[in-house]
């Protein structure tokens, strides 16, 4: 089971170790708000893809307000000069949601080498720049262990190296207890758009076991 399902989704729940990316309560308009959250996330990820965004957490404490927490490797790109970019984003979200109380919090990811989303995006960017996929994967693995990772698995799928036939290659180092629900495993995917076609990148990073005070990070 642990080998097949998404490592993050497998651990989401009030009694488990991962939290939801959208926090809201709505009896009648849940579908509308959920689709709205997806659109907001899409605008942020596509508009600031150079910032290497790790996570977008959207909270709706009331019907009149929305709080958006963005974790990124390069927060300055999202903020812009004198806050110009974040002001544009705020106005776009106000127009999209018809809410006047829009709060955006930007957080810098300091240990980005053990953040699966950022690692996957970094590998994808290197593949687009024609760096060898083996070199990109091995570099990511080495950097992960330097920042405290206890295990990492990286997979690349597609026409690797311009080969005629698509294939999948992966590397794994350290522990990767996918069946252990208390294991803190970060998982993410990314796509590299190359001249040979799309190459899919998957990253799993094991950071140790959860304790009570480490939950919902």
UniProtKB/Swiss-Prot annotation:
Protein name: Small ribosomal subunit protein uS3
Function: Binds the lower part of the 30S subunit head. Binds mRNA in the 70S ribosome, positioning it for translation.
Recorded GO MF terms: mRNA binding; rRNA binding; structural constituent of ribosome
Record-linked InterPro entries: KH_dom, KH_dom-like_a/b, KH_dom_type_2, KH_sf_prok-type, Ribosomal_S3_C_sf, Ribosomal_uS3_bac-typ, Ribosomal_uS3_C, Ribosomal_uS3_CS
Any GO BP annotation: translation
Species: Rickettsia massiliae (strain Mtu5)
Disulfide cross-links: none
A GO term from the CC aspect: cytosolic small ribosomal subunit
């Amino acid at each position: 089971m642990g080998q097949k399902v998404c490592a993050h989704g497998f651990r989401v729940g009030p009694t488990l170790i991962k939290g939801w990316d959208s926090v809201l309560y709505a009896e009648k308009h849940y579908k509308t708000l959920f689709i709205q959250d997806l659109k907001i996330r899409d605008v942020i990820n596509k508009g600031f893809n150079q910032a290497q965004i790790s996570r977008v957490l959207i909270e709706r404490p009331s019907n009149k307000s929305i709080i958006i927490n963005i974790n990124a490797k390069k927060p300055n790109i999202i903020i812009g000069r004198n806050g110009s970019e974040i002001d544009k984003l705020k106005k776009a979200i106000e127009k999209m949601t018809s809410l006047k109380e829009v709060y955006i919090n930007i957080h810098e990811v300091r240990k980005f080498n053990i953040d699966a989303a950022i690692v996957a995006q970094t590998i994808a960017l290197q593949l687009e720049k024609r760096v060898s996929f083996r070199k990109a994967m091995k570099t990511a693995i080495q950097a992960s262990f330097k920042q405290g990772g206890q295990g990492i698995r990286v997979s690349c799928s597609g026409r690797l190296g311009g080969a005629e036939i698509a294939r999948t290659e992966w590397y794994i180092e350290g522990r990767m207890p996918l069946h252990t629900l208390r294991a803190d495993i970060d998982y993410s995917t990314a796509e590299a758009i190359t001249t040979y076609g799309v190459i899919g990148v998957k990253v799993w990073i094991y950071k140790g076991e959860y304790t009570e005070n480490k939950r919902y990070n």
